[in-house]
């Protein structure tokens, strides 16, 4: 059993439960009986340095006999909290020891526990301030697999939501209990902003209550004063929280579509387990032929490929795997990849930016998402991480992008396609030493990528661009039609994009005002193709 199961479909898929029963759950009429949590997300307030503010808050309250616990995803993430003299529990025995000490009121922390989102209870005074720092990591091989192949899917959102809500619930164990829960770390704030709807009704309500009451917080003192309202039992806060929760009488119905998909998967697995592979494949047809998320549909095709292989039909197996890979490039690559699918280029940049902004429940969460992306745009990370971040960067200014080489062993590392039939064909050399020049091999790769581009986008004009540490090329190269985006120029572009996002992510902008603001800001910040080409892309010079 779990108090935070916000998606019932795994009960069907994992335990072969009767789907008709799962569609008619016994549930409470309201969420008014859950514990009181003041959930604060400093990253979506107006505080200039949210991380520093949270650290000062811990220092302020550590001697006030309020139990303080910090949950982090890993041991390495605990290092941050050394500066506030928090005690890290390195072993399970230490976790038990520190939890017992908190419950018996022999100590007040702050204690740091790694990957302890469930399995510990910290009721009443044992923990009045709970800090969840960073996005929980996958626990177990299946979740690690799912995080890779189901990126962005509702299934993965549900898995992470459960982990977050389990963590949030460590300090509030029932009705009549109360605590302050601070959600910090760029990845966590951004994730909640975009996946808000995947959380349970009670948690969503408490996050919204906190957002409405804390969005104007601008200083550390404001944050401390807000926390004191909960800890000192300020009646205005207590009554407001209770009234807002009491309004939630319409709980969401079960997600019938998810349950039906889970039931189909379970029945297909049962057939396969009995070596009835033909029936297993036939069962999955209802998913592969339906209008469902491409990630889920891709997995169904991949299972069909496996079942066909076990059945001795290698030809169908290869065909099914091609269909799977075409829908979800994170799945196994078939022996012969399917033809390249061009990325769409019909929408205007401003329209795509608006669509992205409106996906976030709290618009400032988009900026935290952006910060997470640009963290990998430095020469110290792997080339794969750098290329993925360069691809993702495009979406923040409404540019369609792709990684053709990663998908099909052909084409450029990164492709940015603009709505005016223009493109940047990019080969990334982020791991080169700062003084290394652009050489013949690099030149050859760009030429091959440009040939690929002309074959797949014949009506487009493109610039061959090397993302390189400097703008120096070997003297013997003919570099008249080859361009460079230096790491310094990339950093300048990133800074301009951030300034643009701060402008368009204001919560007071209506949807109609947002599109107008996006159009104007893209021009004023120089983020259209003609601006980027002129300001950030330059020609190589002879070394």
Predicted regions and their residues:
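Interdomain hinge/linker at the junction between the two RecA-like core domains of SF2 helicases
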Residues: 1-60, 213
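Conserved RecA-like helicase motor-core motifs
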Residues: 19-26, 67, 82-99, 400-404, ...
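Conserved strand-helix element at the start of the C-terminal RecA-like helicase core
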Residues: 60-84
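Conserved helicase motor
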Residues: 72-76, 88-102, 113-118
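Long, largely alpha-helical accessory region at the distal end of helicase-like NTP-driven motors
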Residues: 76, 174-301, 308, 510-543
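Catalytic core segments in nucleotide and nucleic-acid processing enzymes
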Residues: 94-98, 104-106, 132-134, 158, ...
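Conserved RecA-like P-loop NTPase helicase motor core
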Residues: 101-191, 432, 454
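Interdomain/boundary linker segments immediately adjacent to catalytic/signaling cores
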Residues: 321-324, 328-381
């Amino acid at each position: 059993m779990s108090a935070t199961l916000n998606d019932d479909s795994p009960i069907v898929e994992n335990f072969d439960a009767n789907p008709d029963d799962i569609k008619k759950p016994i549930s409470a009429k309201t969420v008014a009986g859950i514990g009181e949590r003041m959930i604060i997300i400093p990253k979506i307030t107006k505080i200039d340095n949210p991380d520093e503010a949270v650290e000062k808050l811990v220092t302020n309250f550590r001697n006030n006999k309020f139990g303080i616990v910090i949950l982090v995803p890993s041991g390495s993430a605990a290092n941050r909290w050394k500066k506030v003299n928090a005690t890290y529990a390195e072993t399970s025995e230490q976790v038990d020891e520190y939890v017992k000490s908190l419950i018996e009121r022999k100590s007040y922390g702050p204690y740091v526990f790694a990957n302890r989102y469930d399995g510990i209870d910290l009721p009443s005074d044992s923990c009045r301030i709970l800090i969840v720092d960073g996005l929980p990591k996958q626990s177990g091989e299946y979740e690690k697999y799912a995080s890779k192949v189901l990126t962005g899917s509702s299934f993965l959102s549900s898995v992470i939501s459960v982990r977050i809500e389990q963590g949030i619930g460590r300090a509030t164990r029932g009705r009549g209990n109360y605590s302050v829960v601070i959600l910090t770390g760029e990845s966590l704030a951004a994730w909640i902003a975009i996946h808000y709807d995947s959380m349970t009704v009670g948690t969503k309500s408490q996050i919204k209550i906190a957002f409405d009451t804390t969005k104007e917080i601008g200083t550390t003192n404001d944050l401390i004063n807000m926390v004191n309202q909960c800890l000192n039992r300020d009646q205005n806060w207590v009554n407001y929280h209770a009234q807002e929760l009491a309004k939630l009488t319409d709980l969401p119905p079960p997600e019938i579509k998810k349950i039906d998909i889970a039931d189909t998967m379970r029945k297909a697995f049962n057939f396969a387990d009995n070596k009835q592979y033909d029936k297993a494949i036939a069962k999955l047809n209802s998913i592969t032929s339906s209008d469902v998320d491409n990630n889920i549909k891709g997995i169904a095709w991949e299972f069909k490929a496996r079942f066909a292989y076990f059945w001795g039909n290698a030809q169908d197996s290869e065909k099914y795997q091609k269909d799977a890979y075409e829908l979800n490039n994170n799945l196994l690559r078939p022996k012969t990849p399917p033809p390249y699918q061009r990325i769409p280029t019909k929408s205007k940049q401003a329209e795509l930016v608006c669509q992205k902004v409106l996906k976030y429940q709290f618009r400032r969460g988009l900026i935290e998402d952006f910060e997470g992306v640009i963290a990998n745009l430095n020469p110290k990370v792997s080339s794969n991480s750098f290329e993925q971040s360069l691809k993702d960067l495009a979406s923040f200014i409404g540019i369609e992008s792709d990684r053709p080489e990663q998908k099909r062993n052909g084409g450029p590392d990164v492709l940015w396609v603009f709505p005016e039939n223009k493109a940047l064909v990019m080969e990334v050399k982020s791991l080169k030493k700062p003084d290394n020049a652009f050489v013949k091999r690099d030149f050859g790769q760009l030429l091959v990528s440009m040939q690929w581009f002309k074959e797949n986008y014949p009506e487009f004009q493109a610039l061959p661009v090397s993302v390189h540490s400097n703008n120096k090329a070997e003297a013997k190269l003919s570099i008249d039609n080859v361009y460079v985006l230096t790491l310094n120029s990339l950093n300048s572009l990133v800074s301009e994009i951030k300034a643009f996002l701060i402008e368009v992510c204001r919560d007071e902008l209506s949807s109609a005002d947002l599109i107008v603001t996006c159009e104007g800001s893209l021009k004023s910040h120089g983020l259209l193709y003609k601006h980027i080409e002129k300001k950030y892309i330059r020609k190589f010079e002879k070394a």
